[in-house]
Each structure stands twice: as structure tokens, then as C-alpha cells.
């Protein structure tokens, strides 16, 4: 269920402060954050965030298509190794 429009998008205060500081200074350094729940706003376009996935920080460069999504959507938390090969077919060869 989506968030109410009258509430507006949720962005952690500490993330917004870092974004505003980067915009004022024109600094393009990576912004390190654990806040996967923060919504990407238009002010964040062009910035790079290091989003924590539970183990390490994944760099996420924000583009216009990402506005409205959450930071955590672009930092996968699970490693997919692919489906295991069939052991029976290997044994026959």
C-alpha cells in the first residue's frame, strides 16, 4: 500500500542534510548511508550514495528514473549464485 499523498515522501533528516550540503558546496563525493528506507527525491539526481546492504556499501548513482523509489531497491541484500546443476546428469558422464 503506497504512502498517503498528504504526508509526502519519507526521507531521513540526516540524509537530506547531507544532500543539501552537497548541493550547496557542489561536492560530488559519495554519500554513505544506512538509510535504505529513504525515498529518492529530485534533489538527489546526479549524486552517488553508498547504500548499506547488510554487509558492505553498494555505490548507487541516482538518475531521473529512480525518483520516487527507495534507496534500498538499488542495493540487493541477497546473493544469487544461480540454480544448482543437476547432480544426476553429472554422475552419468
Curated annotation (Swiss-Prot):
Keywords: Ribonucleoprotein, Ribosomal protein, RNA-binding, rRNA-binding. GO terms for molecular function: rRNA binding; structural constituent of ribosome. Transmembrane segments: none annotated. GO terms for cellular component: cytoplasm; small ribosomal subunit. The keyword RNA-binding applies. One of its GO terms (biological process) is ribosomal small subunit assembly. It holds the Pfam family Ribosomal_S19. SUPFAM superfamilies: Ribosomal protein S19. Belongs to the universal ribosomal protein uS19 family. Protein S19 forms a complex with S13 that binds strongly to the 16S ribosomal RNA. This is Small ribosomal subunit protein uS19. It comes from Oleidesulfovibrio alaskensis (strain ATCC BAA-1058 / DSM 17464 / G20) (Desulfovibrio alaskensis). The lineage of its organism: Bacteria, Pseudomonadati, Thermodesulfobacteriota, Desulfovibrionia, Desulfovibrionales.
Amino acid at each position: 500500500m503506497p504512502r498517503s499523498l498528504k504526508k509526502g515522501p519519507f526521507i531521513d533528516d540526516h540524509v537530506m542534510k547531507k544532500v543539501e550540503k552537497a548541493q550547496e558546496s557542489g561536492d560530488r563525493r559519495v554519500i554513505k548511508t544506512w538509510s535504505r528506507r529513504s525515498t529518492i527525491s529530485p534533489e538527489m539526481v546526479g549524486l552517488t550514495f553508498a547504500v548499506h546492504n547488510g554487509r558492505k556499501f553498494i555505490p548507487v548513482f541516482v538518475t531521473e528514473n529512480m525518483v520516487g523509489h527507495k534507496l534500498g531497491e538499488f542495493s540487493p541484500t541477497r546473493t544469487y549464485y544461480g540454480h544448482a546443476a543437476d547432480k544426476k546428469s553429472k554422475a552419468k558422464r
